[in-house]
Amino acid sequence: MGKPIVAIVGRPNVGKSTLFNKLAGKRISIVQDTPGVTRDRVYAEAEWLNYNFTMIDTGGIEPTNDDIIMKQMRRQANIAIETADVIVFIVDGKEGLTAADQEVANMLRKSKKPVVLVVNKIDSLKYEENSWEFYNLGIGDPITISASQALGLGDMLDKVVEHFDRFDADAEDDEYIRIAMIGKPNVGKSSLINKLLGEERLIVSDVAGTTRDAIDSYLETEQGKFILIDTAGLRRKSKVKEEIERYSVIRTYASIEKADVCILMIDAQDGVTEQDEKIIGYAHELNKAIMVLVNKWDLVEKDDKTMEKFKKDLQGSLKFMPYAEYLFISALTGQRTHKILELAKKCYNNYNKRVSTGILNDVISQAILMKEPPIVSLKRMKIYYATQVATKPPKFVFFVNDASASHFSYERYLENQLRNSFDFKGTGIQIEYRQRKE
């Protein structure tokens, strides 16, 4: 299961972006932040009190017309309800309670999702009593903050992480392999999911999320137990294309975060697009197991070398993830679709693989004998031993004399040795150097 997702929701100009940027400004321990598909930063990886979580800013465009504001607020609330594990609902302590706040609070209350009510712009104690009227929203005790001055953020985050125990305890689905089918619209994701569900007779259930758009399908096959995570985009039309794109990014990111295996589906006639690269880039950065499905292969004119050439071109476009598995299919005709779950299971097994310390160090010792680390800044890194410290993805720690003497080319060499020895096809692996005195 991925990290808990925390979504920030609120009216325009209440301080959503200020709060998000303050939290992403390394005033709490931000592990990593990555730009989204749009120019706006959509999410950031964060840590508080040893809890790792993902923040999502539902912000987007800030309208001025009251009717448009209300429509946008509903969309924000829906996307937060659909994707988040905890919702931070931010209101304006200086402006006071509004009808828009009331309506969104009603939506959040009905969703049964944990909500942390935050009253912003309480810049001094004299404004503290401004928070009292927000008790009327009926979604718990308001927490007062000043996002711009970073006041009260610790109390807010304490309240947020209180809800994570419930999230961590919900492990009933741990025996299932979570698969996110990702890709641009109209590439055939829905057709493929329907085919997989239609061909498998042991479907356990279809569990609908909090909105009609979020449906995860549970199925059992000879290969194992799987959850197919729906990554459908917004189906309603909107004049504001940028806003729709932002919500689509949030949906896709949330699906990837929750997945073990991410399957990028591309159109054989289009090849890899910039949008494809950005979408699968999320999965790569989050170190998920990755497969690439080339759909509509039945429509391509080909000879016995076409597939090999096509795959080579794809690997050139996606060279940042050379470990990915590839499969050429037709969701329409069913060509090779029976191999998808089998390959997904293989990727998952490698993603979850553990190597014994003894065998690992035999491989590393042999690798060092064949090629010793280079000299960097007049120093040569000495590797004492290595151990695997995690799975999903496999993470290896190398204890060395001087971590600053490491070189990326040698790290790549070590990674290749690990891959050749232990078959980590379909998953990223992580390498970390830790300094140890001789």
UniProtKB/Swiss-Prot annotation:
One of its GO terms (molecular function) is ribosome binding. GTP 2 binds at residues 183-190, 230-234, 295-298. Pfam families: KH_dom-like, MMR_HSR1. Associates with the 50S ribosomal subunit. NCBIfam families: GTPase_EngA, small_GTP. Belongs to the TRAFAC class TrmE-Era-EngA-EngB-Septin-like GTPase superfamily. EngA (Der) GTPase family. HAMAP family: GTPase_Der. This is GTPase Der.
